[in-house]
Amino acid sequence: KKKRITAFLVDKGTPGFTVRDGYRNVSHRGYNNMILEFDDCRLPKSQVLGEVHKGFEVAGTWLGATRLQVASTCLGRAERALGHALAYAAERKQFGSQIGKFQGISFKLADMAMELKAAELLTREAAWKYDKGTVTEADMSMAKLKATEVLAMIADEAIQIHGGMGLMDELPLERIWRDARVERIWEGTSEIQRHIISRELLRPLGA
C-alpha cells in the first residue's frame, strides 16, 4: 500500500471543485498562484490519468523534463546576472581603479564564471542523454540542483558587487535574485534532488 497515489484530470466546474485566488508570490510575479479546493469532489473512472495507484509514474513522465527546463532557464538568468556584474566591475572605479581589479571582486567574478560553466555542462549532458533516451533521474537532478544553486549564488554575488545599487528596481538584479529563490523549491526541493542522487549512487551497492 506504499506510495499508492492516483492522478486525475479534474475539469473546471466539477461539483466540489473550486478555484480561487491564491497568495502573492515573492518570486515569478508574472503569473497567478491559485488555490484548488476539493470538497466531497467525486470523479468518474474516465478521468483517471494512467492507471489507478500509478500516479507517481504519471508524474515521472514529465517531471524529469521540467527539471531540465528549470535548469536551462536558471542558466540564462545566471548568465545575465554575471554579465551585469562584469560590466559594473569594469566600469565602476574606487581609489582610482576599476573595482574588478580588486582581488575581493575579481575572485567573485572568477568563481561565478566557473560555477556557471559547471552548471551548463551538467545541464547539456543531461539534455543530450534525454534526447538519446539514456538519461537517469540522477542526471536530471544533478542538473537541476546545480543550476538552481548556481543561479542563487551568482544573483547574490552580483548584487554584492553592485552594492546598494544592486537592490534598486532600476536594475534587473533584484528580480533575478527574487526569482532565484523559488527555483530551489519547485520541481523538487534541493533536498529531494540530493536524495535522488544519493539513492542512485547507493542502489548498485544494495543500500
How does the language model describe each region?
Residues 1-87, 97, 190-207:
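FAD-binding core of flavoproteins
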Residues 28, 134, 141-207:
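Alpha-helix capping/hinge segments and adjacent helical runs
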Residues 46-63, 88-102, 126, 160-176:
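Conserved catalytic-core motifs characterized by acidic clusters
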Residues 86-100, 113-146, 159-164:
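C-terminal helix-coil-helix/basic helical segment that borders enzyme active sites and/or dimer interfaces
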